[in-house]
């Protein structure tokens, strides 16, 4: 058990490789990443046995930026017999179970990478799931309750019709979504598809049980670069009154709610109205990430907001390095003013050449 598989958006394999190498080294674990461009996944191989399991436990998954899923895997199973793929897969799971008790496992995902080529296997994976699940249940696995806070999900990751990895992820340190992708439905009345980015961000960064407390009708939000209103829509839907800042036009449907005030101003120059306590700042402006970071820092340092979600666009080559630099600079700015804060960043499914960042100031 010396390998991890990490899913990602195709084209971001190098960022995942750099990130997992950094995170592993912080724990004193060393290895190397196997990267295939545009494959949608990375294999990280540790030099020492059993260290992949340690990484899957000890690297906080919600602190990984570019990985959609993290799991311990077997060696690649190749040349599977189409007449009986299940037997060698069960044997591979049995070998893994000698180190990990799969009696605590609750779910099986038969997956592929998120590429057009791999998606051709999706119908097969869906049909293969039922007989494989039955075979694994005969081993006494997959019997734990899905609501439990410990245990594992079992994964069968097909890279070709006759080649797969088998593995597991920890329930308390993984993505609970199939392929690491949340399935969100585009609201028919939303002004733009960008609304799904903020919806996914809220689902990712804000615990469900806290959402009504942290986003409600008693709060005020500001949306910088709001036009036509995809992000504003998500705040209004949750009851906030929103100052929508943009020279462009906002969707008429948002004006009809009576919950927005359109401010035709430059997002970099706008300041919140005096005597108004702004709770939330959101921002999806197309600008250099270093400039956006400084803008967000200004809002937090001036006490203009308490919580923010914003995007950093990443058109450059050294994307991982740029992200780390921006996040470190923001952290230093806030720490120097003795502010307590929590910062998270994620390359969301609905993000493209960008990441989404969440910062919350604490009392």
Swiss-Prot record:
GO biological process: rRNA processing
UniProt-listed InterPro entries: RlmM_FDX (IPR040739), RlmM_THUMP-like (IPR048646), RNA_MeTrfase_FtsJ_dom (IPR002877), rRNA_MeTrfase_M (IPR011224), SAM-dependent_MTases_sf (IPR029063)
Catalytic activity: cytidine(2498) in 23S rRNA + S-adenosyl-L-methionine = 2'-O-methylcytidine(2498) in 23S rRNA + S-adenosyl-L-homocysteine + H(+)
CC per GO annotation: cytoplasm
Keywords: Cytoplasm, Methyltransferase, rRNA processing, S-adenosyl-L-methionine, Transferase
Keyword presence, RNA-binding: no
Subcellular location as annotated: Cytoplasm
Keyword Transcription attached: no
UniProt EC number: 2.1.1.186
Active site (catalytic residues): 313 (proton acceptor)
Superkingdom as given in the UniProt entry: Bacteria
GO terms, molecular function: rRNA (cytosine-2'-O-)-methyltransferase activity
Binding site for S-adenosyl-L-methionine: 194, 227-230, 246, 266, 284
Subunit structure: Monomer.
Role description: Catalyzes the 2'-O-methylation at nucleotide C2498 in 23S rRNA.
Family affiliation: Belongs to the class I-like SAM-binding methyltransferase superfamily. RNA methyltransferase RlmE family. RlmM subfamily.
Protein name, per record: Ribosomal RNA large subunit methyltransferase M
Gene (name only): rlmM
């Amino acid at each position: 058990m010396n390998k991890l598989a990490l899913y990602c958006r195709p084209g971001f394999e190098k960022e995942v490789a750099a990130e997992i190498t950094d995170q592993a080294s912080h724990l004193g674990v060393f290895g190397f990443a196997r990267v295939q461009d545009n494959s949608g996944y990375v294999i990280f191989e540790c030099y020492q046995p059993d260290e992949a399991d340690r990484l899957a436990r000890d690297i906080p998954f919600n602190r990984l930026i570019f990985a959609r899923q993290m799991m311990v895997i077997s060696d690649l199973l190749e040349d599977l017999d189409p007449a009986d793929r299940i037997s060698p897969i069960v044997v591979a799971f049995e070998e893994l179970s000698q180190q990990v008790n799969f009696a605590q496992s609750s779910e099986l995902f038969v997956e592929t990478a998120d590429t057009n080529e791999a998606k051709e296997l999706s119908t097969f994976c869906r049909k293969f799931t039922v007989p494989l699940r039955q075979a694994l249940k005969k081993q006494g696995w997959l019997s734990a309750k899905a609501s439990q806070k410990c245990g594992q999900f079992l994964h069968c990751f097909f890279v070709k019709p006759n080649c797969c990895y088998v593995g597991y992820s920890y329930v308390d340190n993984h993505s609970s979504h199939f392929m690491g992708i949340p399935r969100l439905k585009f609201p028919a009345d939303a002004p733009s598809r960008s609304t799904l980015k903020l919806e996914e961000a809220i689902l990712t960064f804000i615990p469900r049980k806290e959402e009504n407390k942290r986003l409600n009708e008693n709060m005020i939000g500001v949306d910088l670069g709001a036009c036509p209103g995809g992000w504003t829509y998500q705040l209004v839907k949750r009851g906030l009154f929103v100052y929508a800042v943009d020279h462009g036009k906002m969707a008429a449907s948002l004006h009809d709610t009576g919950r927005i005030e359109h401010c035709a101003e430059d997002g970099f120059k706008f300041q919140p109205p005096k005597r108004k306590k702004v709770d939330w700042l959101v921002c999806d402006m197309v600008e250099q990430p270093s400039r956006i970071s400084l803008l967000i820092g200004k809002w937090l340092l001036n006490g203009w907001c308490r919580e923010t979600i914003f995007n950093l666009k990443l058109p450059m080559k050294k994307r991982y390095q740029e992200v780390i630099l921006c996040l470190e600079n923001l952290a230093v700015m806030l720490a120097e003013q003795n502010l307590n804060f929590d910062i998270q960043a994620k390359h969301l499914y609905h993000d493209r050449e960008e990441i989404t960042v969440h910062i919350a100031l604490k009392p």
